[in-house]
Structures are given as C-alpha cells and as structure tokens.
C-alpha cells in the first residue's frame, strides 16, 4: 500500500510518501495550493491520503476524492492521538 501522509499548514504542507511493502519513505515540502496538490495526486500512485482535521483538510479531502483516492482525516484532539505517560 502506498500512503501519502499530509501535515497541513496554512501556506505549506509536508508530504510523506510511504510504501508499506518496501518500507521506503520520502518527504516533500509543498505549497498548500489546490493546483499543486491536484498535480501531486495525478503524478503519484497513492492508495490512501492521511491528514489531520484542520482548515484546509475539507477541500483537500474533496480533491483527493475527485481523484478516486481513499482518505483518512484524523482529529488530533481525540484520545487516539494522545500519548499517555
């Protein structure tokens, strides 16, 4: 499975491409812009897009769905995202 994990920012987004079979990963710093992410979704073979729930996650989720990509939007405010010591 090829995962694209997005750390969304207002102006820039950090992209992590991860292949679960080979366990190889790569990073890309990308602008948080519709045209750029549209081309990114077209260019790369991605099985699922994972992102945090925040301002731009709505339109990025819609854009990924237009490309037929599965998405997982996570709330970082829930217990599942917290580390307990």
Please provide the spans of the model-predicted regions.
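Phosphate- and other anionic-substrate recognition elements at nucleic-acid/protein interfaces
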Residues: 1-85
């Amino acid at each position: 499975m090829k995962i694209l994990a997005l750390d969304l920012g207002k102006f820039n987004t950090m992209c992590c491409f991860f292949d679960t079979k080979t366990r190889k990963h790569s990073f890309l710093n990308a602008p948080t812009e519709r045209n750029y992410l549209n081309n990114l979704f077209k260019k790369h073979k991605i099985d699922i897009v994972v992102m945090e729930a925040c301002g731009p996650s709505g339109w990025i989720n819609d854009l990924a769905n237009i490309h037929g990509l599965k998405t997982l939007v996570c709330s970082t405010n829930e217990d599942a995202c917290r580390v307990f010591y």
